[in-house]
């Protein structure tokens, strides 16, 4: 299973209260392959996740990947490899006989093409994590004896940085509307005399990540009922600027846009978790 936290930057993830994910393991600071949702997911759907420079399998693709396309001779083997004619890992899982389902919050997933086209089962929800979890659980129950690959793009950490349990969520406008920086347009650079870090918006993103920890707890509880091992990658697709160097939003280069969390772990058959990459490699059956 691949779960992306849209716009979640590494420092916001670290600040969030997330008892589930913190108990699972420590997220690595990874570097996104792109500065916005479409390009980052296009990369991940080719098997290229955000990159970590430490010499750890699955985190550093130069050591070993979770999954990859068989595009070059001599590459180190991945946990699962797909032929090029599958078009990407989603088509690869379908061709391999997996029950494949996905759900996306961001508008890039609204239309059938291009990010969704390989999914036989997909629901665009907008920012609604509870609905997304419900959808994936229903798809999980439909898999019968087939292996399963699930994808979730959670949108709560993306502007307007809101979730359905946040007080005053309807009034939150985010980086494209009236926020603390007073209607500064998205991706605009302010003169240095006006630079300031918008801690209020950053903390709203922190709160959204805390909220998603609980929703992932709901998801993993349901998956665990079947006592089937599930290998899971959770990562940010890109980060966000909250006023650093006079910049807001994403879709352009800045270190805070490239720094994202990544955590790879396994939900074991007995309901426990492991983030030991060697155990994952030995025991994993990607589900």
Where are the predicted features?
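Catalytic domains that recognize anionic headgroups
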Residues: 1-287
């Amino acid at each position: 299973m691949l779960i992306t936290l849209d716009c979640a930057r590494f420092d916001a993830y670290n600040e969030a209260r997330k008892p589930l994910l913190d108990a699972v393991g420590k997220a690595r600071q990874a570097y996104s392959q792109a500065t916005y949702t479409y390009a980052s997911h296009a990369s991940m759907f080719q098997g290229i996740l955000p990159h970590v420079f430490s010499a750890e399998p699955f985190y550093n693709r130069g050591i070993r990947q979770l999954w990859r396309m068989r595009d070059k001779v001599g590459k180190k083997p991945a946990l699962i490899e797909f032929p090029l004619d599958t078009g990407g890992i989603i088509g690869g899982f379908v061709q391999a006989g997996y029950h494949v389902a996905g759900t996306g919050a961001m508008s890039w997933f609204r239309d059938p093409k291009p990010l969704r086209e390989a999914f036989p089962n997909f629901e665009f929800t907008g920012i609604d994590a509870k609905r997304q979890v419900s959808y994936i659980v229903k798809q999980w129950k439909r898999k019968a004896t087939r292996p399963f690959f699930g994808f979730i793009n959670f949108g709560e950490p993306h502007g307007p940085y809101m979730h359905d349990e946040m007080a005053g969520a309807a009034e939150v406008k985010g980086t494209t509307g009236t926020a603390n920086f007073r209607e500064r347009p998205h991706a605009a650079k302010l003169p240095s005399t006006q630079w300031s870090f918008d801690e209020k918006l950053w903390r709203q993103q922190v709160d959204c990540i805390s909220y998603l920890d609980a929703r992932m707890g709901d998801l993993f509880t349901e998956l665990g009922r079947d006592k089937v091992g599930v290998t899971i990658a959770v990562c940010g697709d890109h980060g966000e600027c909250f006023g650093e160097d006079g910049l807001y939003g994403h879709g352009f280069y800045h270190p805070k846009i490239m720094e994202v969390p990544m955590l790879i772990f396994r939900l074991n058959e007995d309901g426990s978790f492991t983030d030991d990459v060697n155990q994952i490699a030995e025991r994993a059956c990607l589900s």
